[in-house]
């Protein structure tokens, strides 16, 4: 099922995206691990768009496109912020960064999803989770 959302940069608005997308995931019969991976990645990407992208400016929007089928879930999230260079984000697993509070969301997303691409100068993330159990 394809869906489109535009939400304000407000953490309370995340449920407007999360609930229907996760309902589509359930309807498409993803296993428990894949469902967890999609949920965590979607939440992290939305929080990152609001916090780091739009810097919690409620006048700026976050746009989301989702396409969930039994074979794959694709979610695209775009903010109105200045973007970032993914290559310049420090590795949160490196010893010197273990106590730093940032960078883990990106690591989670890239670990849990099958494919992740950062587009439009880091203002947009495209996440794909393949359903390995699809018939």
Task: State each model region's role.
Residues 1-4, 50-135:
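Conserved beta-strand-loop-beta-strand hairpin that lines the nucleotide-binding pocket
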Residues 5, 25-29, 53:
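Short amphipathic alpha-helical interaction patches enriched in hydrophobic/aromatic residues
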Residues 9, 30-33, 57, 68:
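Structural signature of the histidine kinase catalytic ATP-binding subdomain
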Residues 21-43, 98-99:
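Conserved short strand/loop->alpha-helix "switch" segment adjacent to the catalytic nucleotide/phosphoryl-transfer site
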Residues 44, 48:
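Conserved polar catalytic motif of the HATPase_c/GHKL fold
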């Amino acid at each position: 099922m394809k869906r489109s959302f535009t939400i304000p940069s407000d953490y309370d608005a995340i449920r407007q995206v999360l609930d229907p997308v996760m309902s589509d995931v359930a309807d498409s019969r993803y296993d428990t691990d894949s469902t967890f991976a999609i949920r965590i990645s979607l939440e992290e990407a939305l929080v990152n768009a609001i916090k780091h992208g739009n810097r919690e400016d409620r006048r700026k929007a976050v746009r989301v496109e989702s396409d969930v089928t039994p074979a794959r879930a694709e979610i695209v999230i775009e903010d109105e912020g200045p973007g970032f260079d993914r290559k310049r984000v420090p590795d949160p697993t490196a010893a010197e960064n273990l106590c730093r509070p940032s960078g883990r969301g990106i690591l989670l997303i890239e670990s849990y999803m099958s494919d992740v691409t950062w587009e439009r100068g880091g203002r947009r993330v495209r996440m794909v989770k393949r359903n390995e159990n699809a018939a």
